[in-house]
Design a protein with these regions (language model features):
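N-terminal anchoring/stem segment of glycosyltransferases
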Residues: 1-76, 80, 104-106, 257, ...
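Catalytic core and acceptor-binding pocket of nucleotide-sugar-dependent glycosyltransferases
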Residues: 157-258, 264, 270-273, 278
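A residue-level signal for conserved active-site and pocket-lining positions in enzyme catalytic cores
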Residues: 26, 98, 115, 154, ...
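GT-A fold catalytic core of metal-dependent nucleotide-sugar glycosyltransferases
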Residues: 89-144, 148, 156
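Charged, glycine/proline-rich intrinsically disordered loops and linkers
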Residues: 59, 63-86, 204-225
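A structural signal for well-ordered alpha-helical segments within the folded catalytic domains
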Residues: 17-20, 92-96, 174-182
Length: 282
């Protein structure tokens, strides 16, 4: 199965802290580290350049100039150029980013939101896959609103999929995300398993109660991953803002994950110990 060698992400100044975690954890678990493609703005590009990373980082410095200094609340209050709000425009930049990255990465690119924290090496993609998506694995009432798949973690290698994705954004029920199930129609689709891109929503909005889902988490100490398991398999990545303090769902999820990592922080799990030290400074 093909390995992932290229990552793409969006980052303005409000995502710098998240991006530090993304790059640190990509470096921690992958050798060599994947090449990273970033859409950013002129103000944020120097901040990104200053983040330590052993792999190559390509930055399109003016791609997000229209969003310089703006957070999600700011963007949602402004009219967009293409869509109803500037935030809808911003999320659709993912389609342009993927097309740009694929110009030099014909074997495929994994898009990651900047707030992805890797806890193990990158997953592999099965041969013959056209599109790899991450299901939310949440209640149907929530997928009806937000989409079956999460737009913060996906892979493809055909640039035409980026164009189709942008077209579908025009009628999507939730920004660039609610249309992903339509993008998957008539494609050779691979769905990432539960251990990949695990967000707070999977724990708090799951079909089963949180107490049942928490029981799926376990510990298996080994140097090849953080040592956290879900359904007895290594947890590959989580989707969270580590610096978030005001949003309760995110904050409680962070405490839950960090408590597991801290239990694993020992001489037998050196990389996990390094990760805990890094996260404690966020």
């Amino acid at each position: 199965m093909p390995t992932i060698k290229a990552i793409a992400t969006l980052a303005n100044q409000h995502a710098i802290t998240d991006l530090k975690v993304l790059l640190f954890t990509l470096d921690l678990w992958n050798s060599p580290a994947p090449t990273v493609y970033v859409f950013s703005d002129l103000m944020s590009a120097p901040l990104i350049r200053a983040i330590p990373y052993s792999g190559k980082v390509h930055i399109k410095k003016d791609a997000l100039n229209a969003y310089t200094g703006l957070n999600r609340i700011d963007m949602e209050s402004r009219r967009g150029r293409l869509f109803a709000t500037l935030f809808a425009d911003f999320t659709a930049e993912k389609t342009h980013l993927m097309r740009w990255a694929l110009e030099t990465e014909p074997d495929g690119v994994l898009f990651c939101d900047a707030d992805i924290c890797h806890l193990a090496p990158l997953p592999t993609i099965p041969d013959g896959t056209d599109l790899a998506l991450s299901p939310h694995m949440i209640r149907k009432s929530d997928t009806d609103k937000y989409g079956v798949y999460n737009a913060g973690y996906l892979w493809f290698k055909n640039p035409e999929l980026a164009t189709k994705w942008l077209d579908l954004c025009e009628t999507s029920r939730f920004f660039e995300q609610g249309c992903l199930e339509d993008l998957a129609t008539n494609r050779n689709l691979y769905e990432f398993p539960v251990q990949v891109n695990y967000g707070w929503w999977r724990l708090w909005q799951g079909v089963q109660p949180p107490v049942v889902l928490e029981e799926e988490w376990g510990i298996f100490r080994e140097e090849g991953s953080s040592g956290i398991t879900v359904q007895k398999q290594p947890l590959q990545s989580i989707h969270t803002h580590w610096s978030e303090k005001s949003d309760r769902a995110t904050s409680e999820f962070n405490k839950w994950v960090l408590s597991q990592l801290t239990r694993l922080s020992s001489s037998k799990t050196k990389k996990t110990a390094a990760l805990v030290r890094f996260l404690s400074k966020i």
